Swiss-Prot record:
Catalytic-site annotation from UniProt: C7 (nucleophile), R13, D111 (proton donor)
Reaction(s) this enzyme catalyzes, per UniProt: O-phospho-L-tyrosyl-[protein] + H2O = L-tyrosyl-[protein] + phosphate
Functional summary from the UniProt entry: Dephosphorylates the phosphotyrosine-containing proteins.
Database matches in SUPFAM superfamilies: Phosphotyrosine protein phosphatases I (SSF52788)
Protein species of origin: Staphylococcus aureus
Entry keywords, A to Z: Hydrolase, Protein phosphatase
Any GO molecular function: protein tyrosine phosphatase activity
pH-activity profile: Optimum pH is 5.7-6.5.
A Pfam family that the UniProt record links to this protein: LMWPc
Stated name of the protein: Low molecular weight protein-tyrosine-phosphatase PtpB
Amino acid sequence: MKILFVCTGNTCRSPLAESIAKEVMPNHQFESRGIFAVNNQGVSNYVEDLVEEHHLAETTLSQQFTEADLKADIILTMSYSHKELIEAHFGLQNHVFTLHEYVKEAGEVIDPYGGTKEMYVHTYEELVSLILKLKDIIC
C-alpha cells in the first residue's frame, strides 16, 4: 500500500509524517509532497533535528504534488485547504482525506514553518499520535 502525505512546501509537516510512518509501519510505502513545493529543497532545520533526535527514517528532498501522485492508494493532507486544492486541480477524489479526517478526528496539523522549536515539537507529537491511530486502521 502506498500512502502519500501532503502539506504546503514539503519541508515540515509532510516529510516529518513520512519519516514517522516509515518507522512505525515499515511494511508500507510512504512518500510526501507539497502543494506549492519547490523541488529538491531540504527539510527545515528543526525537522532535521527531530528526525535525528528520534532516530527516524531519513527525510527526502521536497517534491511538488503532481497528477502522477494521484496513483497513491491513500493521500493524506495536513489541512482541509490542501485537500480542497487537490480536488480543485484534479477533480473530486475518493482517496484524498485530511490526516485527522482519516483517523476520525477533527482538526488540522498546524504549520510550524518559521516557528519555534517548541512548535515543531508539538507538531511532531501530534503527528506521532495521528500516525499511531493510522497504524491501527491500516495494519
